[in-house]
Amino acid sequence: MMRNRSKSPRRPSPTSRAANCDVDLLKSTARDREELKCMLEKYERHLAEIQGNVKVLTSVRDKTFLLYEQAQEEIARLRREMMKSCQSPKSTTAHAILRRVETERDVAFTDLRRMTTARDSLRERLKIAQAFNEKAHLEQRIEELECTVHNLDDERMEQMSNMTLMKETITIVEKEMKSLARKAMDTESELGRQKAENNSLRLLYENTEKDLSDTQRHLAKKKYELQLTQEKIMCLDEKIDNFTRQNIAQREEISILGATLNDLAKEKECLQTCLDKKSENIASLGESLAMKEKTISGMKNIIAEMEQASRQSTEALIMCEQDISRMRRQLDETNDELGQIARERDILAHENDNLQEQFAKVKQENQALSKKLNDTHNELSDIKQKVQDTNLEVNKLKNILKSEESTNLEVNKLKNILKSEESENRQIMEQLRKANEDAENWENKARQLEAENNTLKLELITAEAEGNRLKEKVDALNREVEQHLNAERSYKSQIATLHKSLVKMEEELQKVQFEKVSALADLSSTRELCIKLDSSKELLNRQLVAKDQEIEMMENELDSARSEIELLRSQMTNERISMQNLEALLVANRDKEYQSQIALQEKESEIQLLKEHLCLAENKMAIQSRDVAQFRNVVTQLEADLDITKRQLGTERFERERAVQELRRQNYSSNAYHLGSMKPNTKCHSPERAHHRSPDRDLDRSLEENLCYRDF
């Protein structure tokens, strides 16, 4: 039972553990009851043997008394006959001879009696000495056995106390095991979570390694591209040198052209003065035109945007109204569901309270049953004490055989008490089994209801969260609708003002267009002259611009290459930092795993130590049971020795009786008359032998009874 408790991986519920304890107690009580039954049966057998021995002794005593009386009657009859025969004168000589023979006979008888008494006294002394020696030896042995029995009882009591302590320690250990199992479950969950984190970190690490390898490849490519770009830059530097040389030559040409341009510029200045006046007028008109065109186009764009915004706002309003109606429907549905869930939760809470009350009642019933079990244990202990008292009474019954009927009545009473206790134990076992089944059913129901209650609570929480979210959504949509309505009103007011400004701008445009037509006619003549000058200038500018563009392109390529290199370096530094962080995280996770493994190993070592303590206690119990078996074997050996001594005594008695018979035969063969006179004497002597034999038998039987009681 202790091993089964210690080896159980999964911890049972407290009610099942209490039921197991009650079952163990019932088993122990049943075992004690069976032992008491066996003891009672032995006691009854011993009483029957005592009664048989008493009957045999009484019958032998009666027979010896009858023989003694018959012998005395025969002696008296013979004496009367002799006295009658002695009165005749013829028998005086015979009478004298007879008297002389009688005196000789009496002397011989007295000598024989003296010799037999001396022999019998010596034999009795020898037997008594042997009996006393054996008795002393046996008493010493019995005292030793009693001491060993007392020691064994003390050890058994100590072991029972140790067992109770061990049971308490086992319960404490089971509680610790449960707490450790919970901690282990928590640590396992934490380990699983940490493993998941480690796996995610490993995946991240692998991804980062892949990214690193990709970036390294990319870096290699970029380095290769850098080398190529550097080579290109070298080539471009050479080209730039060539271009600078060409530029110097072209600048010289430009200086020559500049001189011609100065001449042309002087001519142009005189034309420019004429143009400036007209261009100022044209510029002012163009600026005003451009401004008005821009404003008109801006207004048109704004109007189009406003119209689009109004359309979008109307569409958004429709969508928002649809969303609001849908949200209201969902809100109504969620409110209905919340009401149903609240009602179901109230019902479940009521059922849970009922189940808890029933569970408390079942616990009270279990406590009452445990009290009954304790009462039965106390009664059993009382019965054991009664049995011990009866043993003492049986020891008294060795000396007083007349109180047998009272002991038989007490034995019958004890049997009746044991039968009633057996029936009560069976009833208690059935009640316990039923109570355990009811408790397990109620516990299962309570667990199911708790699980349902938890699920309903979670559903309620989710429904409340969804309701709050939907309310927030509806409020946000209402705010958006209000904002859209306000924006639509502002857009309408802006459109009205823009329409008014557009009408004014169109009128101003018509006026400006008339002025523009007159200015364009003046411009056409000046433009022809400017076009000729600009064409030659543009050719030179184009050549310079082309060269500048080529130089800028090369510089841009260089800047882009440098920026890419810097970006790659920054990426490399970031990746190194992330790698270091990942390595630190991995090291921390490994430390946590190592610490958790150490804690688990310590807990497992503690559990193994407790298991070893349990095994040691069980081994001690087994050793003690072996010692008890050895003591029983010793007792059986002593009984066998007693049987051997009894047989030896029987053989000695048989030899003694045979010697007596031989003496009788010798006495018969010596003289018929002497034999006739010896018959009553032998008959008188037979009760003495019976008396001499009876103490031997009494001693043997007393020794047997003592040993039987010790065994009992």
UniProtKB/Swiss-Prot annotation:
PTM sites of type Phosphoserine: 161, 702
A single BP term in Gene Ontology: cell projection assembly
Post-translational modification: Processed into N-terminal 27-kDa and C-terminal 55-kDa fragments.
Tissue: Expressed in testis, predominantly in elongated spermatids (at protein level). Detected in spermatocytes only at the mRNA, but not at the protein level.
Location(s), subcellular: Cytoplasm; Cytoplasm, Cytoskeleton, Microtubule organizing center, Centrosome, Centriole
Ranges of biased composition (kind: Basic and acidic residues): 685-699
Superkingdom, natural source: Eukaryota
Region entry Interaction with HIF1A, spans: 571-703
Annotated keywords: Cytoplasm, Cytoskeleton, Phosphoprotein
SUPFAM superfamilies: Tropomyosin
Residue ranges, annotated region (Disordered): 673-699
GO-annotated molecular function: structural molecule activity
Record's function text: Plays a role in spermatogenesis. When overexpressed, prevents nuclear localization of HIF1A.
Family stated for the protein in its record: Belongs to the CEP135/TSGA10 family.
Subunit structure: Interacts with HIF1A.
Protein name as catalogued: Testis-specific gene 10 protein
Organism field: Rattus norvegicus (Rat)
